[in-house]
Structure formats: structure tokens, C-alpha cells
């Protein structure tokens, strides 16, 4: 007699292109059977892959299943249902009349994201340019609509191509909400806002910059010498650590912690994310409290920084950043996002005053040749440089890639939108 052997070629025989199929057919190899399957296409290539994610066929269930990003979070909406036919038979295998029950297949839903295609492509290209210019270990950039909380763009490097999966092994973590960093001086924005809210920030008041002793530790301004006796406004433009510690004292250490909590640090943003981390706000030792004033010791996610910044940019109303606009199937709209406002620790007046100071940080005389000072377009914000946390061994990274340099800001100043 003869025997028939069936062999599954595994992934090597999956996801064939039309041209590959035609080539196999023309080769006239025997024993090859082709099966139609569903497949998700990603025609935009490297386009917010960590937010969009990707899906692939589950060989056991024969269903396309989301593996990352929106594809994974909203898999149940996207997947649909094969449908089925059920019936009863008697003991002789005869179909029992009127016992057939048919469940029609359900088409998967559609998800609309908040991403702006033009801004997203620009952001992707900007990170590519930055990579070539500075060769950083990693980078990220996000753009949020200040009036709604919609994430208009989100990119990071290293990245992966969702179509080919090239680069995926080294870059599956979503920097927006799964990567905690010590933010450095960009965090000073929130201490400044708290000091203005409490009425202790007087822009023309003077103090002695340079250094300050906390217990057995001496903390210096970033240039190690300071700038002598300067105003609070000048200290902010120079990004003085001594100024921020002074403002923390004037607000009150524990009250400042309350402001950090209300800005949303140390807890998840509550966005529709998968595996969001909350960061940490250590507050046991005096040195931890003081270094938090200028963005060291504390760890945050970019999502938290963006959320807190909306309260400053949006007249004291804090918005939750989100990237899913709506979900709908062929029958109805299943979900439609709307701006979610949370209680902000600052007033509209404080928001306006904080923006005035941040405008000076970029455009003021003491700021010097700030790279964010543009002739044709006026923006405001705060730069930051922080030591990179070594999450595996504790302490800070040594050698190459010791520092995280960043900027958080908004534009245009005349009508704040992004």
C-alpha cells in the first residue's frame, strides 16, 4: 500500500506574497497546498508602531490576534467572529430536523486614532535626523493637542517596522507609558507652578545662586559656580537648582509633595494603555525631597509629564492624554472619546503666570543662545538634562549615554495649541 505524509512548513510557509505564490505554482512542485488566510497590512511602514502595534495569525485559533499597542489593547473589538453552525444528530448520525442554529460571522470593528498623519511623519523624520546627528542610545517625541488631550504624534527610537518586524526585539517597550525616567530640569515647571500658586514666586526677588548644603551633601547649580546674586526670573532662565530648592522651602516641603501628587506623578494617568507604569516619588530623606525639586530621584513617564503640562498650557485645566478617537462596527459607534478634565492644582491665573516665565526661559535675555529661540516662530518651555537611572544595578549609568537631555514646551506662544 501507499502512505501519505502531511508536513506543516511552519512560519516559512506563512504570509506568502502573491509573487511568491505564483513562483511556487510555476515550479510545479508536488504536494503543496495553498490556503487562504487573513492578514493585517501596515502600508505606512514606520508610523507610530508602538502606539498602533501589530497583529499576527494565531496558528491554533486561526484568528488574527493583537500583540502590541492598540492592536492588543482593543483586540476584542478588532477581531470579529468566524460565526458557526450548530446542529443535533440522533444516535444513527441523522440530522434532527429544525435543530440547526446558525450564528452569523461578525466583521471586526474599526478603530480611529487621534494621530495626525502629517505631524506623525514629521516627528518620525525628526527622530531619524536626530539619530544621524547625535547617535543617541534612544529617543522619543510626542505632540499633544493642548485643548483636547489628543496625542497627535508619538515616535521613539529604536523602533520597528510593523510590516516586517525588523528591529522589534530591541524596541518593544512603549516609551510613552512603560519607560520611567528621571526628568531633570523639565520637572522644574511643576515646582514653579506650585510656587506661583502659593504666591511665593516673585520674579524680581533676589537670592544667592551657586550651591547649597543638605546634611552631608552639597548640591550645586549645573555650572558648579552659579551666577552670583540674581533674581528668581534670572535663576529660572539659568535653570538654577538652588532656586528650585529655595522655592520648595517657601512653599513647604510636604505641601510641594501634595502638588506633585495632584499633577499626577506617582500614579498611572488612566489612559487606555496596556501595562502602564506609575513612576516613583521617594519622599523619606531630605536629600530625596531636595533633589526632586530639580527632577532627580523622582521617576516619571512621558505620559505623566504631558498630562501635568496640559494644566499649565490649558488655563489650569488638566487633560488626560489619549490616542483612540473612536471605535465602531458596521452597525454602530461602540466608543467615542471626549476630552477628560481632571482636577488641577493650579488656577487659570497661575497657568498664565507660569507660561509667562516659561516664555522668558526660551526667549529671555539671560537665556542666551537658546536653540529653541526661533525668529519665525515663538515657543516656550523648559530644557532638561538628567543622569540616566541604572534600573538593573541601581545608581546611575556610567560611561557612554550617561545623560538624558529633553525639552517640554508648547507653541505658538500667542495661541497655545500644541
Show which residues each predicted segment covers.
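Conserved small/polar residues in nucleotide/adenosyl-binding loops
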Residues: 1-9, 416-417
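Small/polar-residue-rich segments within soluble enzyme cores
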Residues: 7-108
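Flexible glycine-/small-residue-rich
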Residues: 53-55, 115, 145, 381
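Amphipathic, well-packed alpha-helical segments that form the structural scaffold of globular domains
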Residues: 79-82, 93, 112, 124-128, ...
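Beta-lactam-recognizing serine transpeptidase/beta-lactamase-like catalytic domain environment
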Residues: 90-99, 145-184, 190-415
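Conserved, well-ordered alpha-helix/loop/beta-strand core segments that scaffold catalytic motifs
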Residues: 96-139
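Loop/turn elements at helix/coil->beta-strand transitions in domains of secreted/extracellular proteins
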Residues: 137, 415-418
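Short loop/turn microsegments at loop-to-beta-strand junctions
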Residues: 138-141, 375
